[in-house]
Design a protein with these regions (language model features):
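Pre-Walker A (Motif I) flank of P-loop NTPase domains
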Residues: 2-5
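PAPS-dependent sulfation machinery
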Residues: 35-134
Length: 195
């Protein structure tokens, strides 16, 4: 990968999506317009309260990526982090993925994303010669592995006032149901402050 990636880290509702949107205007950056969760798709153990996953030995990155993109394509929630429904060509995604070799490590996964997304997301510029910017909240837990895999990577860790963060997260999670239990909110914020 010719250019070291930039990883945006932080807990839910801390401002990571805003920063991703601001960086998207930079001509030298290829900003992935959604949370890829690529380390989880590679089978990594994730303990972040809202994205828990046990380690998976036989993870299929490409299959998981198609599932995530399908969920984004079907989303009509205008308050969601990303709405790609009318910009994403799922037939092109399936055709592209059908011709790709499986990604087994973070470098391969990020390379697949840089090759795939400009071809299937309408209006997304080419990633050729640009630094990738990736934001997935649970990647805070695997930041050391990312730093070892991408030694020249840069990390932007956003820390928001915990009280404001807690209120925003509880309001966000309450839009579909009652307010979430404070314990789960607290645990997700706690993991966002200890990197």
């Amino acid at each position: 990968m010719p250019h070291a990636p930039i990883f945006i880290l932080g807990s839910h509702k801390s401002g990571t999506s805003l920063l991703r949107s601001l960086l998207d205007g930079h001509p030298d950056l290829f900003v992935i317009p959604f949370e890829t969760h690529f380390m989880a798709l590679l089978g990594r153990w994730i303990t972040y309260s809202y994205r828990k996953q046990a380690p998976v030995d036989d993870a299929n990155f490409l299959e998981g990526l198609v599932e995530i993109l399908e969920s984004y394509a079907q989303s009509v929630d205008r308050q969601a982090d990303v709405v790609l429904g009318d910009r994403l060509d799922m037939d092109a995604v399936r055709a592209f993925v059908g011709e790709m070799d499986e990604a087994d490590d973070p470098i391969q996964a990020l390379t697949v994303l840089k090759q795939l997304l400009p071809q299937v997301v309408e209006g997304l510029d080419s990633a050729q010669g640009k630094r990738a910017v990736e934001k997935s909240v649970e990647h805070l837990e695997v930041a050391l592995e990312l730093a070892q895999t991408f030694p020249k990577a840069q990390f932007i860790h956003i820390v928001r006032n915990p009280y404001a963060n807690m209120v925003a997260l509880r309001k966000f999670k309450a839009k579909d149901q009652a307010y979430p239990l404070i314990n789960k909110v607290y645990k997700s914020l706690e993991s966002g402050y200890y990197w």
